[in-house]
Amino acid sequence: MRRCEVNSKPISEYFGIPCENREMAKCLLTSSLSVRTKLLQTGVSLYNTSHGFHEEEVKKILEQFPGGSIDLLKKQNGIGILTLNNPNKMNAFSGVMMLQLLERVIELENWTEGKGLIIHGAKNTFCSGSDLNAVKALSTPESGVALSMFMQNTLTRFMRLPLISVALVQGWAMGGGAELTTACDFRLMTEESVIRFVHKEMGIVPSWGGTSRLVEIIGSRQALKVLSGTLKLDSKEALNIGLTDEVLQPSDETTALEQAQEWLEKFVSGPPQVIRGLKKSVCSARELYIEEALQNERDVLETLWGGPANLEAIAKKGKHTK
């Protein structure tokens, strides 16, 4: 039985199976790409029952662990402020907070006027990971995997939001808090802040998608150092390895948030549909094969070409404005 080729590659490289003809190979490859493209669409869950994931059952367990809140402020300038609010426990995620984070992500997916998002922790601390009360109750491998799938789904949808996102790290970002920073497009740290992946000391590995995202940000070699060494990454070291984008001057909580907004504003200036289109294009370029990413680029362009922002820019000859 001969092997079919798509784009000069044996189809077995994609699926590990031989096929009878070129058309079948193309069909299989197209179906696989279509699935990934659908997952990139706003509002689509990463897992379902076919993966052994029962979301409602996980939610019933998580709602038994109250404490803290995830607060969202949507500003008129198109920048949202997401606050992890559980200061008595260094903003650790309770079960209810995990549920609320998904709710806020869904709300942001439907915020058509949104352009940017800043996530930070209350009282000058970012997040210390998971509340141990919830962790102790989820002691079996099955429950651990279920929680992992829930948070992987939430943070992947967070990462794919059509908003340019920034993690403002003050104080400590540990464990799950460190993983959360990697779901943002950018990271800003105050001078005294520290990011630390403490998972090895807890006898586990990152389980909220943090490993994949960390490798994407700083490369596999540096990621292995950070994870296996449980390194305490202060702002200087995080900047040196490319984990953070800028270090803010010493300031209180309010001033740091103002600085973060000022930093973000230069990236989100312009019409929402253009900023959102740019973010969608970057997401597809990162996660899809080149052919499908190019198709997505054309799809986004079709919604913008000849639109109000495009016509106004042409009228002002904005393309050549310095």
Curated annotation (Swiss-Prot):
It is found in: Cytoplasm, Cytosol. The modification N6-acetyllysine is found at residue 232. One of its GO terms (molecular function) is methyl/ethyl malonyl-CoA decarboxylase activity. It comes from the Eukaryota. Its EC number is 4.1.1.94. SUPFAM superfamilies: ClpP/crotonase. GO terms for cellular component: cytosol. InterPro entries: ClpP/crotonase-like_dom_sf, Enoyl-CoA_hyd/isom_CS, Enoyl-CoA_hydra/iso. It catalyses: (2S)-ethylmalonyl-CoA + H(+) = butanoyl-CoA + CO2; (S)-methylmalonyl-CoA + H(+) = propanoyl-CoA + CO2; (2R)-ethylmalonyl-CoA + H(+) = butanoyl-CoA + CO2. The modification N6-succinyllysine is found at residues 232, 316. Its main location: cytoplasm. It holds the Pfam family ECH_1. Keywords: Acetylation, Cytoplasm, Lyase. Belongs to the enoyl-CoA hydratase/isomerase family. Decarboxylates ethylmalonyl-CoA, a potentially toxic metabolite, to form butyryl-CoA, suggesting it might be involved in metabolite proofreading. Acts preferentially on (S)-ethylmalonyl-CoA but also has some activity on the (R)-isomer. Also has methylmalonyl-CoA decarboxylase activity at lower level. This is Ethylmalonyl-CoA decarboxylase. It comes from Mus musculus. The gene is Echdc1.
